[in-house]
Amino acid sequence: MTQFLISIMDITPLSDSLSGDKALYDKAFKLVPGYRQQKICNLKNDAAKCRCLAAGLLLNYTTRTFISGSVSGFITGSLADNTPTVKNIPFPVTVSAAVCTYAQEYDYETACIANGKPYFKEHENLHFNLSHSGNFAVCIVAGMPCGIDIEGNRPFKPSVAKRFFSKTEYHWIYDTENVSVQAERFFRLWTLKEAYAKATGNGIAAEIHAASYVPDTDSDGLCFADSEIGKHFQIKEAEHNGLRIAAVLSDSAF
């Protein structure tokens, strides 16, 4: 079994279906477990409904694929691989593929810890996390605690960076006058902070200042400024369709 798998899904077909003939949307909805169906029904916004449904499809597909070990050459591997950036990640999953291959035996029962992090109730050695931004949802399934985040570059206020980032991180953002590069760096850091907080399960409010990041001298990625944290956590970064993706994996249980 590979130790982790990250996948991504463009949810546009679900959105198009919901606003059109609803055939694909309705077919997908009937597949996901009852708790997710109820969650979807409680959402008032169509975009939110599609994201929630896509998360269920993607989690089922990624869990099955991870357990079967049927994916190679994408973001699969172990903590022994210390490369922070991998160019051929994440593994793309279409809505139609997830619907056609849906296997309900992989709909493991989930619950949430006090801070809202989800987990599989009866599979303590199997971990997962989900995130979404715009028309994309991402999922990580791993054999260790993990967190994932996806964000799109957008305008941000310097005051936000100054408030939430370390001095080193702040100076790294602004050591260029290129506004686009500044935004890219800001959201690289932000996705890492979100992913780290989700990996620990403590939430972003508790972890925003707990770990800071610096450029990795051996690659074009980022690494933990505190080498002690870096001994127990590993970073994986990617870019997909202009979106930043960060995953943090741990060799420790929380």
Model-derived segments and spans:
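Core catalytic alpha/beta fold that binds nucleotide/phospho-ligands
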Residues: 1-254
